[in-house]
C-alpha cells in the first residue's frame, strides 16, 4: 500500500496487569491498521534504558525504567496510512488527565505514571524503536483481505 508506515506500540505492565491487551489490540484492528509484529516479554533494564535514552537526564528516568521492568510488556508493530500520527491520537495525551474520552488513556487511565501504553511520536522514532525491540525476521509482511475495504 502506498504511503504506508509502521509504528511501535507497547502496552506497559499496568495495561497488561489490568487485562487491557485485547481491548487495545481491538481498537487498532478496528481502525484498520495491520499488526505485523507482536511480542509478550519481560523487557531487560538495558533494553528499557536504550528505549528511553532521550529521557535519561529527567528526574523520573530511573523510576520509569523500574516500572517498565516490573512486569511483562506487549510490544507491537502496526502498519498503515499515517499510523504514527493516528496511533498517537488513539492513545491520547501522555497525561491521562488531558486525554479526551474515547482515547485509550482517556478511557482507562488516571495518572501519568500509569498511562498503560507507549506509542512512537514520529516515523523516525518508530523506526528506531522497532529496530530496538524486533529483529527484521520477527516482522510479518502479509496482505490483509480487508485492505481493499479500508483503503481506496
Curated annotation (Swiss-Prot):
The keyword Hydrolase does not apply. Gene3D superfamilies: Nucleoside diphosphate kinase-like domain (3.30.70.141). GO terms for biological process: cell differentiation; cellular response to fatty acid; cellular response to glucose stimulus; cellular response to xenobiotic stimulus; CTP biosynthetic process; endocytosis; GTP biosynthetic process; hippocampus development. Keywords: ATP-binding, Cytoplasm, Differentiation, Endocytosis, Isopeptide bond, Kinase, Magnesium, Metal-binding, Neurogenesis, Nucleotide metabolism, Nucleotide-binding, Nucleus, Phosphoprotein, Transferase, Ubl conjugation. Its EC number is 2.7.4.6. Signal peptide: none annotated. It catalyses: a 2'-deoxyribonucleoside 5'-diphosphate + ATP = a 2'-deoxyribonucleoside 5'-triphosphate + ADP; a ribonucleoside 5'-diphosphate + ATP = a ribonucleoside 5'-triphosphate + ADP. It is found in: Cytoplasm; Nucleus. Hexamer of two different chains: A and B (A6, A5B, A4B2, A3B3, A2B4, AB5, B6). Interacts with PRUNE1. Component of the SET complex, composed of at least ANP32A, APEX1, HMGB2, NME1, SET and TREX1. Within this complex, interacts directly with SET. Also interacts with TREX1, but only following translocation to the nucleus. This is Nucleoside diphosphate kinase A. It comes from Rattus norvegicus.
Amino acid at each position: 500500500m502506498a504511503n504506508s508506515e509502521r509504528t511501535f506500540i507497547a502496552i506497559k505492565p499496568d495495561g497488561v496487569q489490568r487485562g487491557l491487551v485485547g481491548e487495545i489490540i481491538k481498537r487498532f484492528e478496528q481502525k484498520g491498521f495491520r499488526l505485523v509484529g507482536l511480542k509478550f516479554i519481560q523487557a531487560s533494564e538495558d533494553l528499557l534504558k536504550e528505549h528511553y535514552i532521550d529521557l535519561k537526564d529527567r528526574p523520573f528516568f530511573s523510576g520509569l525504567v523500574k516500572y517498565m521492568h516490573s512486569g511483562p510488556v506487549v510490544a507491537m508493530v502496526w502498519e498503515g496510512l499515517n499510523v504514527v500520527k493516528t496511533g498517537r491520537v488513539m492513545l491520547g495525551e501522555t497525561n491521562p488527565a488531558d486525554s479526551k474520552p474515547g482515547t485509550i488513556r482517556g478511557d482507562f487511565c488516571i495518572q501519568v505514571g500509569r498511562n498503560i501504553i507507549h506509542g512512537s511520536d514520529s516515523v523516525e522514532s518508530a523506526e528506531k524503536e522497532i529496530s530496538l525491540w524486533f529483529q527484521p525476521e520477527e516482522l510479518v509482511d502479509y496482505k490483509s483481505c480487508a485492505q481493499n475495504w479500508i483503503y481506496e
